[in-house]
Amino acid sequence: MSAASGGFQPRERRFSVQEQDWETTPPKKLRLGAGSKCGGRRLIVVLEGASLETVKVGKTYELLNCDRHKSMLLKNGRDPGEVRPDITHQSLLMLMDSPLNRAGLLQVYIHTQKNVLIEVNPQTRIPRTFDRFCGLMVQLLHKLSVRAADGPQKLLKVIKNPVSDHFPVGCMKIGTSFSVEDISDIRELVPSSDPVVFVVGAFAHGKVSVEYTEKMVSISNYPLSAALTCAKVTTAFEEVWGVI
């Protein structure tokens, strides 16, 4: 669901598995805690099928990606085009920087191709650069959590599957797919006071295929990247809920 990224390739950089502290973005309003099952209006986004896995290179671990490890992937019979952690990075930047998240009305989960489920604390500030994001993901996948720099709060943590166990009871669960024939106006799907789940594919090709969604929708006449899908969804919710 994501177009190939252009521009300059990141400089070669290796990461050892060392625990680091990461910044938080303080909210303007009191927000629901990460993973809260209580009611109240809230958008829950699941980045499904994310390519996040580590590989040992020499004595260090790196986040596997198509640019840095192409020859290794080909040697093991894997399509480099399917190993795109940058899609998750771009999507997280869109989501966590959104006014909807700053207002305390967004919760994000990441479900990887390797069946690892990650909960993202709404106060997490995603690294701006891809290299730093890779280091963060290596730390998370090996330590199972990443804490805030100013306290014991966990900003990212690996949690127990399935993701549906972490949803508010009775909430609507919607998947996004370009293959759906009819186009939906996202604003018409926004509930006035209830939580709702949107599932966005965090991969380069294919479609979302999960058992827990109740309906699938297409939101554009054109195929969209995962990051743009996230931006359109959060913007629609901001418009309906009056988040400026």
Swiss-Prot record:
GO annotation terms (biological process): blastocyst development; nucleologenesis; ribosomal small subunit biogenesis; rRNA base methylation
Enzyme class: transferase
Site note Interaction with substrate rRNA, residues: 84, 125, 128, 132
Region feature (Disordered): 1-33
Keyword annotations from UniProtKB, A to Z: Methyltransferase, Nucleus, Phosphoprotein, Ribosome biogenesis, RNA-binding, rRNA processing, rRNA-binding, S-adenosyl-L-methionine, Transferase
One GO cellular component term noted in the UniProt record for this chain: nucleoplasm
Sites of Phosphoserine modification: 5, 16
EC number: 2.1.1.-
Positions contributing to S-adenosyl-L-methionine binding: 176, 201, 206, 219-224
Signal peptide segment: none
GO molecular function, one term: rRNA binding
Gene3D superfamilies: 3.40.1280.10
The protein's assembly and partners: Homodimer. Part of the small subunit (SSU) processome, composed of more than 70 proteins and the RNA chaperone small nucleolar RNA (snoRNA) U3.
Protein name, UniProt field: Ribosomal RNA small subunit methyltransferase NEP1
Protein species of origin: Mus musculus (Mouse)
